[in-house]
C-alpha cells in the first residue's frame, strides 16, 4: 500500500534509517535500565544509573555505523546485501567476541564496537564516537546517492 503512493525510494529508506536509529537508542536505553534493575534486585552496589545509561548509549555511534554499512550496501543493489550482513556478523565476532575467539588486535580494530568501551563507567572516547558518526553519515549519504541512481524495477 505504501509503495502505491508517491514516495521516493530514498525517502522511504531514510525513514527506515530513522526508525532504526530510534529503535537502537531505545534498545540500548532499555538494556541499561535492565542492568540497573537487575543490580538493584540482587542488592548490588554498582555504578549509578547515569553511568550505566551513558555506558549503554555510548555504543550508539558504533551501532549506527554498522547500520549505515547495511544502508549503503542496499543502496548499491540487492546483490550487495551480503556485504551488509557480513558487516553485522563481523562486527559481532570481532567486536564483543573478538577476544574470546582469539582474533588478533589489528583485525578486531576493524570492527566499530571495539573503538568504544563496553565497560560501565569507562570514559567514552569522544573522538572515536565523533569519527563513527561521521563515517555513518558518509555511508548514509553514499547509500542515498547510490539508491537515486539505481533502477528499482
Regions found by a protein language model. Name each.
Residues 58-93:
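A structural motif at transmembrane helix-loop-helix junctions in multipass membrane proteins
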Residues 1-9, 31-34, 75-88:
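Hydrophobic alpha-helical transmembrane segments
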Residues 18-71:
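Secretory targeting signals
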Residues 30, 34, 38, 69, ...:
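Alpha-helical membrane-inserting segments
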Residues 38-46, 77, 81, 146, ...:
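Membrane-interfacial segments
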Residues 15, 19, 50, 54, ...:
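Alpha-helical transmembrane segments of integral membrane proteins
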Residues 1-23:
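Helix-loop-helix units of permease transmembrane domains in multi-pass membrane transporters
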Residues 83-153:
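Terminal transmembrane helical anchor/hairpin motif
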Amino acid at each position: 500500500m505504501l509503495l502505491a503512493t508517491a514516495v521516493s525510494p530514498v525517502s522511504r529508506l531514510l525513514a527506515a534509517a530513522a526508525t532504526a536509529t530510534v529503535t537502537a537508542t531505545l534498545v540500548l536505553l532499555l538494556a541499561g535500565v535492565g542492568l540497573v534493575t537487575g543490580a538493584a534486585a540482587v542488592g548490588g552496589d554498582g555504578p549509578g544509573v547515569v553511568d550505566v545509561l551513558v555506558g549503554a548509549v555510548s555504543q550508539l555511534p558504533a551501532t549506527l555505523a554498522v547500520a549505515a554499512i547495511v544502508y549503503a550496501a542496499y543502496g548499491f543493489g540487492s546483490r550487495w546485501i551480503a556485504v551488509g550482513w557480513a558487516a553485522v556478523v563481523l562486527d559481532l565476532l570481532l567486536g564483543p567476541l573478538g577476544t574470546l575467539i582469539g582474533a588478533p588486535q589489528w583485525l578486531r580494530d576493524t570492527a566499530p564496537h571495539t573503538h568504544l568501551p563496553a565497560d560501565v563507567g569507562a570514559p567514552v572516547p569522544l573522538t572515536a564516537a565523533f569519527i563513527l558518526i561521521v563515517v555513518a553519515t558518509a555511508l548514509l549519504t553514499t547509500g542515498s546517492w547510490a539508491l537515486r541512481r539505481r533502477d528499482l524495477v
